[in-house]
UniProtKB/Swiss-Prot annotation:
Swiss-Prot/TrEMBL keywords: 2Fe-2S, 4Fe-4S, Biotin biosynthesis, Iron, Iron-sulfur, Metal-binding, S-adenosyl-L-methionine, Transferase
Enzymatic reactions: (4R,5S)-dethiobiotin + (sulfur carrier)-SH + 2 reduced [2Fe-2S]-[ferredoxin] + 2 S-adenosyl-L-methionine = (sulfur carrier)-H + biotin + 2 5'-deoxyadenosine + 2 L-methionine + 2 oxidized [2Fe-2S]-[ferredoxin]
NCBIfam families, sorted: bioB
Record-listed [4Fe-4S] cluster binding positions: C59, C63, C66
UniProt keyword Metal-binding, yes or no: yes
Residues at which [2Fe-2S] cluster binds: C103, C134, C194, R266
Enzyme Commission (EC) number: 2.8.1.6
Subunit-level organization: Homodimer.
Protein name: Biotin synthase
CDD domains documented for this protein: Radical_SAM
Species of provenance: Pseudomonas aeruginosa (strain UCBPP-PA14)
The record's free-text note on cofactor binding: Binds 1 [4Fe-4S] cluster. The cluster is coordinated with 3 cysteines and an exchangeable S-adenosyl-L-methionine.
SUPFAM superfamilies for the chain: Radical SAM enzymes
UniProt GO BP: biotin biosynthetic process
């Protein structure tokens, strides 16, 4: 963090104010975002997470963007919940190549009572490896939320996806208020929140602004804000949707950074379609977190060694864990910058 004066954290953003941010000249917007970013973060550090699909396919939700929905024929087979030991093996590999947070995702509307004990064991096991833990399991009850917190879960991911106004065009099987209720349960249980959205689903700029307003006007900002670019998958209703303009995507990252100055803004799904120049602009706009590994649940992600090569060219280093920044782990992270390793344990949910 630089000596730049801290920027006030707000929870009262209006649509007119956020529109004005989006309408700034591109260079002015990036300058403002970078100034805000430097007030709270080292601009040359990026937090690195790994995401694993622990249960794939046949989700009862009808999210139009998702290849895991049981409503669409995307060629993705239904798979059972992964064994706890296999999850821990993948987590150990993730740590070895530099990840500091391990995220586990399941294609559920909500976790069942029979699966919860295994999920809790996954959390406990990953924590013992010295990694931060994150899960995305769908809607939670208050009791399930507390059980995850008691097991030591650090983050819970539950995206809002888009604005309340556009939401009904994308999902009908879960309400916006249900998503907000799950986030409230997570906060009440003392866990950190990971929540963001997706660009490229046919939404307007006002919808992008509306999503960010919902997140920034929560009583506390999410600690992590993933901004996804739609990955178009054949068989889903959004497979033929128009591509997001790269500059519009960067603008959204920059506005998210300005509105939520203390949050990690994650450059999430869609990086496979981004060239190195676009990713560099994303970091300039204030993105300071990425998913690292071969897969994002069921879609491609840039290979880990390519990420580290890009980091080296840009002078970026992976962010250390504040609580567990031991010398051995940091040395492994630094070594990953110069080595080219292939991950053999990342779960490829879409493989034939």
């Amino acid at each position: 963090m630089s000596a730049t004066a801290s920027v006030a954290t707000r929870h009262d953003w209006s649509l007119a104010e956020v529109r004005a941010l989006f309408e700034q000249p591109f260079n002015d917007l990036l300058f403002q975002a970078q100034t805000v970013h430097r007030a709270y973060f080292d601009p040359n550090r990026v937090q690195v997470s790994t995401l694993l699909s622990i249960k794939t396919g046949a989700c009862p939700e009808d999210c139009k963007y998702c290849p895991q929905s049981g409503h669409y024929n995307t060629g993705l087979d239904k798979e059972k919940l992964m064994e706890v030991q296999k999850v821990l093996e993948a987590a150990a590999e993730a740590k070895a190549i530099g990840s500091t947070r391990f995220c586990m995702g399941a294609a559920w509307k909500h976790p069942s009572a029979k699966d919860m004990p295994y999920v809790l064991e996954m959390v406990k096991g990953v924590k013992k490896l010295g990694l931060e833990t994150c899960m995305t399991l769908g809607r939670l009850t208050q009791e399930q939320t507390q059980a995850l917190a008691d097991a030591g879960l650090d983050y819970y991911n539950h995206n809002l996806d888009t604005s309340p106004e556009f939401y009904g065009n994308i999902i009908t099987t879960r309400t916006y208020s249900e998503r907000l209720q799950t986030l409230a349960y997570v906060r009440e249980a003392g866990m950190k929140i990971c929540s963001g959205g997706i660009l490229g689903m046919g939404e307007s700029v006002d919808d992008r602004a509306g999503l960010l307003i919902q997140l920034a006007n929560l009583p506390e900002h999410p600690e992590s804000v993933p901004i996804n670019m739609l990955v178009k998958v054949k068989g889903t209703p959004l497979a033929e949707e128009k591509d997001v303009d790269p500059f519009d995507f960067i603008r959204t990252l920059a506005v998210a950074r300005i509105m939520m100055p203390k949050s990690h803004v994650r450059l999430s799904a869609g990086r496979e379609q981004m060239n190195e120049q676009m990713q560099a602009l994303a970091f300039m706009a204030g993105a300071n977190s990425i998913f690292y590994g071969e897969k994002l649940l069921t879609t491609k992600n840039p290979q880990a060694e390519k990420d580290m090569q890009l980091f080296a060219r840009l002078g970026i280093k992976p962010e250390e864990r504040e609580e567990h920044a031991d010398e051995v782990h940091q040395a492994a992270i630094e070594q990953a910058l110069v080595e080219q390793r292939e991950s053999k344990l990342f779960y490829n949910a879409a493989s034939a």
